């Protein structure tokens, strides 16, 4: 009579060009060119260089700026990049995506479905990448399975399930 919930921490999307090469935007390089070296710091939550599939490239980045008066200008510059879908301030992004404000930079951005974001090209050694690039971290990788071996008669709210709800429903079903 045990409750079992099966879910995942995130989905995954292909992030390669038609020729198989990685599809990446190196945001630190772009910002350094526009605003100068050391004017910003692009932080990627996927930091392990696991070259089997993602090579520390993902769909999410947060950016800290030295000069806070340049936040709007930097956001406008990033919005010009075709494959960056989401560009928002810390406050707006943390509110919309339920992120901790004290752990996010001044700007939050996410790439399109088949694009990754890197810091600088020199920071990502993709020479050992033998398979087509695939990664996660953005809106297109949020959908994951949520499977229960028991019928769930009532949900916490009318909102959709999140993978972190698994523990609650496993216990509630026990």
Predicted features along the sequence, with ranges:
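Feature captures the catalytic ectodomains and active-site-proximal regions of enzymes
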Residues: 1-174
């Amino acid at each position: 009579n045990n409750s079992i919930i099966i879910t995942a921490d995130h989905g995954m999307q292909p992030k390669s060009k038609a020729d198989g090469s990685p599809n990446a935007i190196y945001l630190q390089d772009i910002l350094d060119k526009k605003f100068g070296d050391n004017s910003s710091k692009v932080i990627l939550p996927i930091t392990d260089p696991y070259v089997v599939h993602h090579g520390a490239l993902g769909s999410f980045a947060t950016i800290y700026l030295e000069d806070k008066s340049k936040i709007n200008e930097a956001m406008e510059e990033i919005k010009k990049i075709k494959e960056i879908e989401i560009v928002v301030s810390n406050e707006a992004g943390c509110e919309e995506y339920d992120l901790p404000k004290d752990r996010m930079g001044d700007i939050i951005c996410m790439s399109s479905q088949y694009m990754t974001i890197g810091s600088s090209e020199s920071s990502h050694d993709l020479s050992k990448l033998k398979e087509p690039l695939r990664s996660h971290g953005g809106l297109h990788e949020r959908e994951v399975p949520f499977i229960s071996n028991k019928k769930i008669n009532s949900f916490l709210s009318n909102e959709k399930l999140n993978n972190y709800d698994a523990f609650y429903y496993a216990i509630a079903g026990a």
